[in-house]
Design a protein with these regions (language model features):
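Walker A/P-loop
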Residues: 2-40
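Amphipathic alpha-helical transducer elements in NTP-driven molecular machines
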Residues: 18, 41-44, 63-67, 78, ...
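Basic, amphipathic alpha-helical bundle interface domains used for macromolecular binding and assembly
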Residues: 168, 173-277
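C-terminal engagement/docking regions of AAA+ P-loop ATPases
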Residues: 223-233, 239, 247-377
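Short glycine-rich substrate-engagement loop in P-loop NTPases that contacts/grips substrate
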Residues: 40-71
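Conserved RecA-like P-loop NTPase ATPase core
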Residues: 9, 47, 79, 92, ...
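Canonical AAA+ ATPase core
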Residues: 35, 54-59, 75-88, 96-184, ...
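Phosphate-binding P-loop
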Residues: 1-4, 12, 68-71, 107-109
Length: 377
């Protein structure tokens, strides 16, 4: 929301997509919200406001009465987004990307801070939905509860309300409690933070990792298929991702984007749901690629030194492999801890990082053992 980027929640019915979307508006103080359940019969009047009969009569002007509709909302939730007709979808293109709405012969700058859409399915192919799909920068899959203890907790929680209504005690307390209201973001804070986010720098090593990810997306191995996929990510989407990275750094009191901010961007890169995990693996490998390359180079050099017995026991006369191994281990541990401390890295993502690093640490241990061969008679 602070980055101003759009979100789409994808998943089967009954996994609380609507509840999540509706509760996001409670983050803003005095925010106006608009929500609508799309259908094949939805009209632009229902989303953007009806045509003003008074304007037509008095000045022969075609304008919509937008008060209470999407053009005046801070937070918007559109359910079943792909069921909307072409007229609504085409208007949403400029609403989402430029936050502009053409009302008659006037162009309105919208107060829109966050637009959340939801659907049970991906957009159908061949129906001209690609441009609108590309506008949704963050793509989150909502899935049923996996852990048994969490499922039981949900069953026993009398406050859980999958409708998203604030009628449940837990939601009402959050929305109306005075203590929480002090934490809500005001319009002035939002504008100030937005300017500060623009000033956040991006480290050169972050750009290097992004380049590796971008190249890797040209040949993605999905579900061990024989043919690799070339996953297209538009320049506009990369620009929006950079904004998300700056927001991540700002929210964690940093003046520059670090590599630890990069892991969640896999949510912005997939086109088909089965690509998600493969792209997450690509991002994780890209994050640790500099350290992996150092390990490969060191192992190759060590193999040569063992083969030709070129290393001496004194550090001055040979390469300090022990020191390099310690340095690599420290680098792995440091980045793993940074990812673990990042506010936007989920527990599932942390588990994937740990699984990847287990093999990395094993390789370091084997390499450490190999160094002993340098001193064998």
């Amino acid at each position: 929301a602070l980055a101003g980027e759009s979100v789409i929640l994808l998943g089967p019915p009954g996994v609380a997509k609507s509840m999540v979307a509706r509760q996001l508006k409670t983050a803003f103080r005095d925010a106006h919200s608009f929500e609508y359940l799309m259908s094949r019969f939805s009209t632009p009047d229902e989303i953007f406001g009806p045509v003003s009969i008074q304007k037509l009569k008095s000045s022969d002007t075609y304008e919509r009465a937008v008060d209470g509709y999407l053009p005046t909302a801070d937070v918007v939730f559109l359910d079943e987004i792909w069921k909307a007709g072409p007229a609504i979808q085409n208007t949403l293109l400029t609403v989402i990307n430029e936050k502009l709405f053409r009302n008659g012969n006037k162009e309105m700058h919208l107060p829109l801070k966050l637009l959340v859409a939801a659907s049970n399915e991906l957009p159908a192919k061949g129906e001209g939905l690609e441009a609108l799909w590309d506008r949704f920068v963050i793509r989150i899959e909502s899935r049923p509860i996996k852990l048994e203890k969490n499922f039981r907790a949900m069953l026993l929680d009398s406050h859980a309300d999958f409708s998203g209504s604030t009628g449940g005690l837990g939601h009402a307390d959050f929305a109306n409690n005075a203590d929480f209201s002090e934490l809500k973001i005001t319009g002035e804070e939002y504008a100030e933070w937005s300017e500060n986010i623009n000033r956040i720098g991006v480290k050169e090593e972050v750009l290097d990792v992004i380049s590796v990810i971008r190249k890797s997306l040209r040949a993605v191995n999905v579900d061990e298929a024989a043919e690799r996929r070339n996953i297209y990510v538009s320049d506009r989407r990369w620009k929006n991702i950079a904004r998300l990275l700056r927001t991540s750094a700002f929210m964690q009191d940093r003046e520059e984007v670090d590599c630890c901010d990069l892991l969640p961007i896999y949510h912005c890169l997939w086109q088909e749901s089965e690509e998600r995990d493969a792209i997450r693996t690509i991002v994780i490998r890209a994050l640790f690629a500099p350290l992996a390359e150092k390990l490969v180079e060191m192992k190759n050099a060590l193999a040569e030194d063992i083969k030709y017995h070129r290393i001496r026991k004194t550090p001055d006369e040979g390469r300090d492999y022990e020191g390099e191994i310690e340095s690599l281990s420290d680098g792995l541990t440091s980045l793993e801890h940074q990812l673990g401390d990042n506010l936007f890295v989920s527990s599932d993502d942390k588990a994937e990082v740990s699984a990847y690093l287990r093999d990395f640490y094993k390789e370091l241990a084997f390499t450490r053992q190999d160094t002993m061969k340098l001193y064998e008679d």
